[in-house]
Amino acid sequence: MHNEKAPQSPTLAQLQQKVDEWIHTYGVRYFSELTNMACLTEEVGELARVMARKYGDQSFKAGETHDPSEEMADVLWVLICLANQTGVDLTQAMQRSFEKKTKRDATRHINNPKLKE
């Protein structure tokens, strides 16, 4: 029997560090924040296209990817770039977001008849 542990998924902080290292090794430098915001919008649009075709009423064109994970990773990549550029610690930001949503929405969705099956 092996005592090997499965590799752990990287944390948000580790992903932020890996993206920063990649940018400075291969990308020379970050694009401007405004350019990266435009890139993020573009990547979200590409994800929307895949979702519309896979889960909506549209059909795929020849040669289009059917896998939303590629587009989701692209969205996350550019979002991490923006976080790095603007000094946002995504781990702390997510913790604050969970706290805010939990306080604000503690009973909101439980009492929503639209979400009952």
Task: Indicate where each model-derived feature is located.
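Flexible "arm" and connector segments at domain edges
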Residues: 1-72, 76-117
